[in-house]
A protein has these predicted regions:
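Fe-S ferredoxin-like electron-transfer domains
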Residues: 49-195, 208-223, 227
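Structural motif corresponding to the C-terminal cap of alpha-helices
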Residues: 165, 203, 339-343
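Residue-level recognition of oxygen-bearing side chains
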Residues: 21, 156, 198
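Cysteine-centered loop/knuckle micro-motif
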Residues: 161, 203, 252
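Iron-sulfur-associated redox domains of electron-transfer enzymes in respiratory
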Residues: 2-6, 13-84, 211-583
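Canonical Radical SAM [4Fe-4S] cluster-binding loop centered on the CxxxCxxC motif
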Residues: 195-202
């Protein structure tokens, strides 16, 4: 039994476990205390002071930071006294004194935690006029822009980057000159940044944001010479709805497809189809390596953030990486080869757009070593869920009112195995569903067989019997957990045959391109689990749940590739990797 502490908050008696903070105690009785720097279990530093409350422990009232101040027996707390209100308002005014206040043109306007608090506390813009250092925009990275003129020094991005074991950003200088930058004052694109975008989704303001590629898409849609096709990743269908007021994890596939068609795309396709294609290639690759005992463990290659992490920090594992392109890359490849041939089109006239929950996909789209057609990129523009939402709103489409629509052929039919790619463990489970039937020759009837790889835990392990042979697998999400697994493999402590790694904690549902959830919600709701529920529900409701049973995938092999792992498939659907320096 936990020792309990009794206190009063705003006159209400509260009993909470010893070690709880005032913030947590207040939350337990329905009192929300505002924060800016606080991220539960990740950035508990009490730096912003927005969470100040008055606490009396028998020595008179004192203003304390509730996010780090522990409760004590008999404590009396006021969360909304006149002194507290004044202190919070003054703190906000001081933050604004050095803040770039171009709110109307800021990408986070309407979804800015600082803006929201300033509105709630009636803060006026020009109470204090502080010295404002002026910073140049850092546009050096392929996926994002850093605008330190809007930074409030909350260090949430630093915590997110450290959590990923990348740690390429931190506090530089002191006093008024303090800024969040890169080691040695390098530009972000000159560091070992892996483009995951976790810093973006954890930033409370507009200091970090994805590079906006929507103008490229608008121009392509307006070009009569271009055939513009779009693919949507699995996690998009459970994220996009949040931008239009739906509950977290709501499946909005039909409305998403309808909106894309209204935007003018010539073909609206499902990346889940390409995920099924990936499984066909990856399962074949795994069985080939497993039977030969070569380059094991096989490690998945669907997450470009993980791939870049491996290239920068663990190049010794490059031989273990699957040579399969990611589903985004595979779709682009088949669009500019098989689809072009089938439709009688010149590949250079096809403009492929990806809607992804991931900022690292922008980096992947720029990789010249991934092209299926010489001189042409597989992907012409990769946009985030947030960018798509802005396009839909800009076009005046009433997302909630439009009728549902279906994906187009020949890349519109997909299995539930492709759907669960968006959740951590999904790629592994999808591959095992196919590998099981290929190896045993038996029908997989119980889909709970591989449930051990589900869930948001950072590292999951399982051993499965495939026709009398044991296969040891591991799943890691978040690069801190990937590091743990890789170090155990290096030391010989663990031996696995197959490893799935996703750069973002929880997988693509928690990607750097997903809708940004304010810390006031994400501190108390498991965003990863809520969005993943939608994907597993979608999988359960689909009539087709195994990649190798997808008739559209079978048609691609029958008409074009021959068989999984063929020479043609390797040329178009597979790739290589490059060792990179850290700085």
């Amino acid at each position: 039994m936990n020792e309990m502490v009794n206190l009063k908050i705003n006159g209400v008696a509260v009993s909470v476990p010893k070690g709880s903070t005032i913030l947590e105690a207040a939350k337990s009785i329905g009192v929300d205390i505002p924060t800016l720097c606080y991220m539960k279990d990740r950035n508990e530093i009490g730096a912003c002071r927005i969470c100040m409350v008055e606490a009396n422990e028998g020595r008179g009232n004192r203003l304390v930071a509730s996010c780090v101040y522990p409760v004590s027996e008999g404590m009396e707390v006021s969360t909304n006294s006149i002194n507290v209100q004044k202190a919070r308002k003054t703190t906000l005014e001081l933050i604004l004194s050095t803040h770039d206040r171009k709110c109307l043109s800021c990408v986070r306007s309407g979804n800015c935690e600082l803006q929201k608090l300033c509105n709630e506390y009636g803060v006026e813009e020009s109470v204090f006029d502080g010295e404002k250092p002026v910073y140049e925009l850092d546009c050096s990275a392929p996926h994002m822009v850093r605008d330190n003129n809007k930074c409030i020094l909350c260090r949430r991005c630093v915590a997110a980057c450290n959590e990923q074991f990348v740690s390429v950003i931190g506090a530089n200088n002191r006093g008024i000159d303090t800024n969040i930058g890169s080691v040695y004052d390098l530009k972000l694109g000159e560091t070992g940044c892996i483009s995951c975008g976790q810093c973006i989704v954890n930033c409370p303001v507009g200091a970090l944001y994805e590079k906006d590629d929507t103008q490229k898409v608008w121009e392509a849609l307006a070009d009569p010479e271009k055939i513009v096709v779009v693919q949507t990743a699995p996690a998009v269908r459970v994220g996009l709805g949040e931008e239009f007021g739906y509950e977290m994890g709501t499946i909005v596939t039909g409305k998403m497809v309808a909106a894309l068609k209204m935007l003018g795309f010539d073909g609206v396709f499902d990346t889940n189809f390409a995920a099924d294609l990936t499984i066909m290639e990856e399962a074949t690759e795994f069985l080939g390596r497993f039977n030969k005992g070569e380059n094991l463990p096989l490690i998945t290659s669907c997450s470009p953030g993980w791939i870049k992490f491996c290239e920068h920090y663990y190049p010794e594992f490059i031989p273990n990486l699957s040579s399969c392109k990611s589903p985004q890359g595979m779709f682009g490849s088949v669009a500019k080869t098989y689809y072009a041939e089938k439709m009688g089109l010149d590949p250079k006239d096809i403009f492929v757009v990806s809607v992804m929950p991931c900022t690292a996909k922008k980096f992947e789209a720029e990789r010249t070593d991934h092209s299926a057609v010489a001189g042409l990129p597989d992907i012409d523009a990769s946009i985030t869920v947030r960018e798509l939402a802005r396009m839909i709103k800009k076009a005046g489409i009433n997302f909630r009112m439009i009728p549902d629509a279906e994906f187009d052929s020949p890349f519109g039919l997909a299995s539930g195995a492709g759907t669960i790619f968006g959740a951590t463990g999904g790629v592994m489970e999808a591959a095992l569903r196919t590998a099981y039937e290929v190896v045993t020759g038996n029908e997989l009837e119980d889909f709970a067989t591989f449930s051990a790889v589900r869930g948001v835990e950072g590292v999951k392990e399982a051993t499965y019997n495939l026709n009398g042979t044991e296969v040891k697998v591991a799943v890691a999400s978040g690069l801190a957990n990937a590091k743990k697994v890789l170090e155990m493999v290096k030391s010989g402590e663990k031996k696995y045959d197959f490893i799935e790694i996703m750069a973002c904690p929880g997988g693509c549902v928690n990607g750097g391109g997903q809708p940004i959830v304010p810390a006031s919600v994400s501190n108390f709701v498991d965003v990863r689990a809520e969005r993943a529920k939608g994907l597993y529900k979608d999988d359960e409701n689909l009539p087709l749940r195994k990649s190798h049973k997808n008739p559209d995938v079978k048609a691609v092999y029958d008409e074009f590739f021959g068989e999984p792992g063929s020479h043609k498939a390797h040329h178009i659907l597979h790739t290589g990797y490059t060792e990179r320096t850290k700085y």
